[in-house]
């Protein structure tokens, strides 16, 4: 992609409903962070420039990010996470797995508490992808290892536990084991911050006494606050 093509896409994004400031893309094609940021916007459904987003995300894979700066580590991991998601949509599962692994490696390489990405969510992306690739047993083993490593740590809001138990709940639901699915989802919810205004909706969702586990989990998800908007300790 040329600088001219890059700047045309910047203005396309700036004219969209998102309306990001132009300085977000300072440095143009010479800046991996500018390329990653533009790619995120291009990948949005309302802009739908997935091919261009894919090209820009791929250009970031070999970026020389500064491991001492949390914002750079986070931005790099977030870009690889989104690239993996795009590749998963395209059925390119091996490439998607490689890139989510790279995102996890980057995020886990430091002790930073990130602002926008969650370590547990990165792992969940990997587990869901393994499940999609019929490697569910491998995913379950990793989930159990994460839960065992973190379940007794005195940390109240733990993304590893939330996403780990949630994954186990989804598997139980797919297998038709409703009570087990609900139990795991209770454990998942216990690992996250739940503002008071969400309590009634969650109680109602969990109170369902039928055997459609997938429906119950969908209702629980609807009643659960967006994890991106909550405080996490890890």
Predicted regions and their residues:
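Alpha-helical segment of the N-proximal tetratricopeptide repeat
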Residues: 3-20, 29, 33-48
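Flexible helix-coil transition and linker loops at the boundaries of alpha-helical arrays
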Residues: 19-30, 60-74, 105-119, 148-158, ...
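Residue at a conserved register position within TPR or TPR-like alpha-solenoid repeats
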Residues: 42-44, 80, 87, 123, ...
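Structural motif corresponding to the intra-repeat A-B loop/turn of tetratricopeptide repeats
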Residues: 45-47, 90, 133, 168, ...
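Terminal, low-structured helical/coil segments at or just beyond the last alpha-helical repeat
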Residues: 197-234
């Amino acid at each position: 992609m040329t600088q001219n093509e890059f700047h045309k896409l910047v203005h396309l994004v700036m004219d969209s409903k998102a309306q990001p400031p132009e300085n977000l893309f300072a440095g143009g094609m010479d800046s991996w962070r500018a390329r990653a940021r533009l790619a995120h916007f291009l990948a949005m459904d309302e802009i739908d420039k997935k091919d261009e987003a894919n090209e820009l995300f791929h250009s970031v894979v070999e970026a020389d990010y500064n491991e001492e700066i949390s914002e750079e580590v986070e931005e790099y991991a977030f870009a690889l996470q989104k690239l993996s998601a795009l590749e998963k949509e395209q059925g390119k599962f091996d490439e998607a797995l490689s890139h989510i692994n790279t995102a996890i490696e980057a995020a886990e390489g430091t002790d930073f508490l990130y602002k926008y990405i969650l370590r547990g969510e990165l792992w969940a992306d990997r587990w869901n992808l393994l499940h999609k690739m019929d490697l569910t047993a491998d995913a379950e083993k990793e989930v159990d290892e994460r839960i065992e490593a973190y379940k007794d740590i005195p940390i109240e809001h733990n993304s590893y536990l939330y996403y780990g138990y949630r994954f186990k709940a989804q598997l139980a639901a797919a297998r038709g084991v409703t009570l087990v699915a609900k139990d795991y989802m209770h454990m998942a919810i216990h690992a996250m911050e739940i503002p008071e205004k969400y309590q009634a909706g969650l109680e109602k969702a969990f109170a369902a006494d039928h055997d459609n586990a997938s429906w119950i989990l969908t209702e629980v998800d609807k009643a659960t606050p967006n994890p991106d908007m909550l405080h996490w300790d890890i």
